Design a protein with these regions (language model features):
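Conserved ABC transporter NBD signature motif
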Residues: 55-66, 70-71
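Conserved ABC ATPase signature
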Residues: 87, 128-132
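Conserved ABC ATPase "signature" region
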Residues: 95, 99, 106-124
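Helix-to-loop junction immediately C-terminal to a conserved catalytic motif
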Residues: 47
Length: 243
């Protein structure tokens, strides 16, 4: 289980996260909010790339800073088409990331083959990443996020800028990961997270304003017709701080 307790984060005088607390058991969670709501800050704190000014991030009751390098084997992170090396082939990139995760050379070929097959990228694995389409780049990022079979997966805008067919393909791969994993997905594409999310987390101006199932949220906010209408109703007047 992932637990955040009373997380705060400031950028100079601006409060990016304000007393954020969450408990996430295994399942898929959609993190929704407008630009500047605090999504990126929250994701970076969960991944350990950013330290909060206050509060704790716990994995199975242990603070992540106490886990050190062990946390790399627990978490998988796919940023929004960042951190890729265009000159690398997909296979070479995954080998590099597998090394950082501590996967042994003996296990590496089988593990890379597994994740490539999962995202349907086996045939493209020997091509330079610079020749990939946007959807292929996103799939290779998801492949590196699931190297080593992590129990916590963080995906930042996994379907942004993709065509409808590719978005469906990515969504299906994310849904198939659910089970014993905690999967946190930040997105603006409401229709991509609605069918697969266990719960939706709504964040506005650095505060968590609600967390519930899609059905309960839509009922709670006045019988709105789906999550997209709910999103527009809650966030259309948002005047938030920097993300």
């Amino acid at each position: 289980m992932l637990c955040l307790t009373n997380i705060t984060k400031k950028y100079k005088e601006k409060l990016a996260l304000d007393d954020v607390s969450l408990e996430l058991a295994p399942g898929i969670y959609g993190l929704l909010g407008p630009n500047g709501a605090g999504k990126s800050t929250l994701m970076n704190i969960v991944t350990g790339n950013l330290k909060p000014d206050g509060g704790q991030v716990l994995w199975d009751g242990k603070e992540i800073k106490s886990l050190g390098a062990q946390y790399r084997s627990i978490i998988g992170y796919a940023p929004q088409q960042q951190g890729l090396y265009d000159a690398f082939t997909g296979k070479r990139f995954l080998a590099y990331m597998a090394t950082l995760k501590g996967i042994s050379k003996k296990e590496m070929p089988e593990e890379i083959a597994r994740v490539l097959s999962y995202v349907n990228m086996t045939e493209a694995a020997n091509r330079p990443i610079g020749t990939y389409s946007g959807g292929m780049k996103q799939r290779i990022l998801i492949a590196q996020a699931i190297l080593g079979d992590p129990k916590l997966i963080v995906l930042d805008e996994p379907t942004a800028g993709l065509d409808p067919k590719e978005r469906v393909r990515i969504r299906e791969r994310i849904a198939a990961l659910a089970g014993d994993k905690v999967i946190l997905v930040s997105t603006h594409v409401v229709s991509d997270i609605e069918p697969i999310a266990k719960e939706i987390i709504l964040i506005k101006s650095g505060k968590i304003i609600d967390q519930d199932t899609v059905e309960h949220l839509c009922s709670k906010y006045g019988r709105v017709n789906g999550l997209e209408e709910l999103y527009m109703r809650i966030f259309e007047e948002d005047t938030s701080c920097a993300d």
